[in-house]
Amino acid sequence: MQEAQYLTSDLSVKAKASNLNLWYGQKQALHDINIDIYERKITALIGPSGCGKSTFLRCLNRMNDLVGGCRVEGLVEVDGFNIYDPAIDVVAVRKRVGMVFQQPNPFPKSIYENIAYAPLMHDLVKKGSDCDQLVEESLKGAGLWEEVKDKLKSPGTALSGGQQQRLCIARAIAVKPEIILMDEPTSALDPISTQTIENLMVTLKEQFTIVVVTHNMQQAARVANYTAFFHLGELIEYDETEKIFVSPQKSKTEQYITGKFG
């Protein structure tokens, strides 16, 4: 079984992986991953390119189902429910576990419709004042309301890159998820927009559990409560972020964070 640094804590576990293995065809991409994701905390996944961190992230809402030849063994649980149980509704899983991608990907619709589309589709609200209120609340939650409140009918694609990413975050929180997955959400953004998104993440963890993949170790150190280091599909070490960066227990972790490989 994969060795990793485990935490002893009475924190509430929101999601967990147990003996998780994943293959793309004949290639094994994840090896015996065991990890607890804590509620209303930010967990950063770090490691060199191809280490498995984004693959693991996508296991948490079954996005890997969309990849041909993908096979998963082991458990991934959210609130104690195995999300890979054949009886589980995958759409319901993805409603509870939202996703924000590396490149901002607003729908080719108005700002308003970007937010309203999924809640209307899932019958969370009806058209009218309730929907208007949800759109406003979601945009406020993503720190975007004041910038767009007078142009809600404008295309979401007309916004700046940083605004588009916040629109995607607003779209994700509009369906009231419990977990938000972020796959390198600032890698395509300028430093000012990056800082805005980082500040937003810290605010959002008051309501949501956040798991973020990042190549930026400084970003992990700034925003994450916990950090997991992946290498060659294995979870090498997982602990409080400060411990990972100040006093890592594994030599491979120390080598990575000091730039000796990566």
Curated annotation (Swiss-Prot):
InterPro entries per the UniProt record, alphabetical: AAA+_ATPase, ABC_transporter-like_ATP-bd, ABC_transporter-like_CS, P-loop_NTPase, PstB-like
Q: Give its localization.
A: Cell inner membrane
Q: Name one GO cellular component term.
A: plasma membrane
Which keywords does UniProt give here? Answer: ATP-binding, Cell inner membrane, Cell membrane, Membrane, Nucleotide-binding, Phosphate transport, Translocase, Transport
Highest taxon listed in the record's lineage:
Bacteria
According to the UniProt entry, its GO molecular function terms are: ATP binding; ATP hydrolysis activity; ATPase-coupled phosphate ion transmembrane transporter activity
Q: Does the keyword Cell inner membrane apply?
A: yes
UniProt binding sites for ATP: 47-54
Mind telling me which Pfam families this protein's record contains? ABC_tran (PF00005)
Against SUPFAM superfamilies, the record matches this protein to:
P-loop containing nucleoside triphosphate hydrolases
Protein's UniProt keywords contain Acyltransferase? no
Could you mention a single GO BP entry for this protein?
Answer: phosphate ion transmembrane transport
Which CDD domains does the entry mention? ABC_PstB_phosphate_transporter
**EC number(s)?**
7.3.2.1
Note the PROSITE patterns from the entry. ABC_TRANSPORTER_1 (PS00211), ABC_TRANSPORTER_2 (PS50893), PSTB (PS51238)
Q: Which reaction does it catalyse?
A: phosphate(out) + ATP + H2O = ADP + 2 phosphate(in) + H(+)
Q: Domain ABC transporter spans what residues?
A: 15-257
Listed under subunit, the entry gives: The complex is composed of two ATP-binding proteins (PstB), two transmembrane proteins (PstC and PstA) and a solute-binding protein (PstS).
**What is the role of this chain?**
Part of the ABC transporter complex PstSACB involved in phosphate import. Responsible for energy coupling to the transport system.
Query: According to its UniProt record, which protein family does this protein belong to?
Result: Belongs to the ABC transporter superfamily. Phosphate importer (TC 3.A.1.7) family.
Q: What is this protein called?
A: Phosphate import ATP-binding protein PstB
What is the species of this protein?
Wolinella succinogenes (strain ATCC 29543 / DSM 1740 / CCUG 13145 / JCM 31913 / LMG 7466 / NCTC 11488 / FDC 602W) (Vibrio succinogenes)
